[in-house]
Design a protein with these regions (language model features):
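Flexible inter-domain linker/hinge segments
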Residues: 98-143, 433-486, 492-509, 604-642
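Ferredoxin-type iron-sulfur electron-transfer modules and their immediate structural context
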Residues: 393-400, 405-535, 544-568, 574-579, ...
Length: 652
């Protein structure tokens, strides 16, 4: 994302132009002073960048289908496969494109008319996009817009880089309600929780706006992964047979719905809360309904929700892979479909799996921790995905991918979900934008019906010495979510903390397998500068890691193993540390000599000569920024001492 973080806000604050590398949370920080916010709100908003949010149509907990990237996008600046730069919001760029790409525009218009003429297809598109759906390419623009440039811009949403490079977007901002309240509602069954969500979805105020702005479902496994205190209480009561109607020892029914309402005034907020509480009287909750409008309280609820994926992933067995999928059902099907989904996952033996997500939109994520080490495990996963396809598509006509891009895992099922006519239209769009099929191949469109059960990425355990094993076990919990990268000082310069773990896993895999010693040696050599030497080692990465993994600790281990006690490098460093004054005095003439050489030879010649010596002998590389030698005078030392004394006096 570095160097792609420019932005501009319109004079009325209702539009913002963004480059793709800026993080979603940063956009919210920029808009907050004006009472506005970035409409898409995925749980990963503190780490996800605008480009990824748009190209995956990652929506989130509140924006639903009414304020996702597709609905708030105004224009896009893209670079096509042939190198053409098109800014759909710039009249000059549009006019130029109409001349240079006449056939391209004509084909977009033909596809638009073909889809609209096929009334059955057009109606299916409207129906499919009435809920969250990112399976395949985005066909909705063909029925929403007449202007071919509007269609082109909106085709980018959810396209996962398969059509063009997105270099800039202009989007509508959203009003940020100043008054908010949330409640964590607990139900004894997932079906009862779903019925309550369906009822709350129907609540609207006098202006026609939804009273409930968000309803996030968390099943029992989600609650267990974060040690939710209410879940622990429920578990204890169930274990002691203290709950009538609940099978002793069966805590799998407890389901939470994190509910949020927002308003323009305190009075309006209270009206909303009263309306929701009245609605919920028709349902039995495990504990009484209690809303809070205190940010310090409800922010904890939402922090729990945002951390579910990495927290559940962190409980996986070492060596297994944490997989997440997101599906969507129509709201009227929610109670039955949700219960069947839970039963289906359990039937396949995924006892540590969890279901959670945006219940108000009928959109759920489910997480499984999967081993691919045996053919039996691969077959189990294949059977699960086939049954998911049958449940979601064949029975409920829902979405196999709701908000995070199709990906390779769902690519084999795109045609099955959409049907031949829609799939043919998607293929025509792909062929128009990328006739050679070079952009992100195999994603969205894949001719291999088994591509989702091939080429699995291994997650080998890190190999460390016995004394360092505790730290490596912590790092083994990494699910490579990337939440750490926002705090990593070297991210964008060399490697991020996540990438360091990824590379160390590959190094460990090669060590364990012994399959390619040459590649192992090359990786270890190439890792030294970007992986080891440029890591700050300060542990800031752990502050945004849900598992608290400190990649700096891993770097310290690598450094210690590279320079063990008794080695020449360790002895040299130890000597310098204990004789710094003498070493400093000895190095002063070296700096003077380097400065003399620079003044005599000039920058160009000095750089060339020292670079040659560096390559031949390994001496430190000279740069024009290298300082001259300097020795503090007695008066300067006295002044420094006086300043330190005064500072100490002020502190006292």
């Amino acid at each position: 994302g570095k160097n792609w973080e420019k932005y501009s806000i319109s004079a009325d604050y209702e539009q913002i132009t963004l480059q793709p590398g800026i993080i979603g949370q940063r956009v919210n920080e920029l808009l907050a002073p004006y009472g506005r916010k970035f409409a898409p709100d995925p749980a990963s908003v503190k780490s996800a960048m605008v480009g990824g949010i748009v190209m995956n149509n990652a929506s989130g907990m509140n924006c639903g289908t009414h304020a996702n990237s597709d609905k708030v996008l105004i224009s896009a600046r893209i670079i096509l496969m042939d190198g053409t730069l098109l800014d759909t919001g710039n009249p000059v760029s549009r006019a130029s494109f109409e001349v240079s790409h006449r056939d391209f525009i004509r084909r977009i218009c033909e596809l638009r008319d073909e889809i609209r003429t096929n009334e059955k297809l057009a109606e299916r598109i409207r129906y499919k996009y009435s809920i969250k759906n990112v399976t395949g390419l985005n066909l909705l623009p063909f029925v929403r817009f007449d202007d071919p440039f509007e269609i082109i811009a909106h085709l980018m949403v959810g396209s996962e880089g398969t059509l063009a490079f997105l270099s800039e977007v202009t989007m509508k901002t959203e009003y940020d309600y100043p008054y908010k309240a949330s409640a964590m509602l607990y139900f004894k069954t997932i079906k009862e929780a779903s019925r309550a969500v369906v009822a709350m979805k129907k609540l609207v105020d006098e202006t026609g706006e939804w009273t409930v702005k968000g309803a996030e479902m968390l099943d029992y496994k989600s609650l267990s992964s974060v040690n939710d205190p209410v879940f622990l209480k429920y578990k204890g009561e169930v274990a002691s047979s203290a709950l009538p109607g609940v099978e002793p020892g069966d805590e799998t029914g407890l389901t939470a719905v994190l509910t949020e309402t927002k308003a323009r005034t305190p009075e309006e907020l209270q009206q909303n809360i009263s309306a929701i509480e009245a609605c919920l009287q028709a349902f039995t909750t495990y504990i009484p309904v209690r809303f809070t409008d205190r940010p310090e309280e409800y922010s904890k609820y939402w922090a729990i929700r945002s951390g579910i994926f990495p927290s559940v992933g962190g409980t996986r067995q070492p060596g297994t892979t944490c997989l997440i999928e997101d599906i969507a059902f129509h709201i009227e099907d929610l109670p039955e479909a949700t219960a069947e989904l839970q039963q289906l996952i359990a039937r396949h033996g995924y006892n540590d799996a969890c279901i959670y997500g945006h219940a108000l939109e009928g959109n759920y994520h489910f997480i499984i921790n999967q081993s691919f080490s045996t053919q039996a495990e691969v077959k189990r996963y294949e059977d699960l995905m086939n049954d998911i396809k049958t449940l979601v598509v064949d029975k409920y006509d829902g979405s196999l991918k709701a908000e995070h891009g199709t990906g390779r895992n769902m690519a084999p099922f795109v045609c099955h979900e959409w049907g031949d006519d829609a799939y043919k239209a998607m293929k025509a769009v792909k062929e128009l934008f990328d006739p050679q099929g070079l952009l992100n191949p195999g994603v969205i469109f894949n001719d291999d019906p088994q591509c989702h059960i091939k080429n699995f990425k291994p997650l080998p355990l890190l190999v460390m010495s016995d004394k360092r094993q505790a730290t490596s076990l912590v790092a083994d919990k990494c699910i490579e979510c990337g939440f750490c990268e926002v705090n990593c000082l070297s991210c964008g310069f060399t490697l991020s903390s996540r990438q360091r773990i990824v590379l160390q896993r590959e190094i460990s895999r090669l060590k364990q397998s012994g399959e390619d010693p040459t590649r192992l040696a090359l990786l270890e050599k190439q890792y030294r500068y970007p992986g080891n030497q440029t890591c700050a080692g300060d542990g800031l990465c752990s502050m945004s890691c849900p598992m608290g993994i400190n990649t700096g600790d891993l770097t310290h281990i690598i450094r210690q193993e590279a320079l063990p006690k008794g080695s020449l490098g360790y002895k040299a460093g130890d000597f310098v540390a204990n004789h710094f004054a003498g070493v400093k005095s000895a190095l002063r003439p070296v700096l003077s000599l380097a400065n003399f050489g620079h003044s005599l030879l000039g920058t160009k010649a000095m750089s060339g000569i020292t670079k040659g010596l560096h390559n031949a002998l390994g001496i430190p590389l000279w740069t024009p920024a290298m300082p001259k030698s300097y020795q503090l005078q007695a008066t300067e030392l006295q002044a420094t001492s006086t300043m330190q004394h005064n500072s100490a006096a002020l502190v006292a």
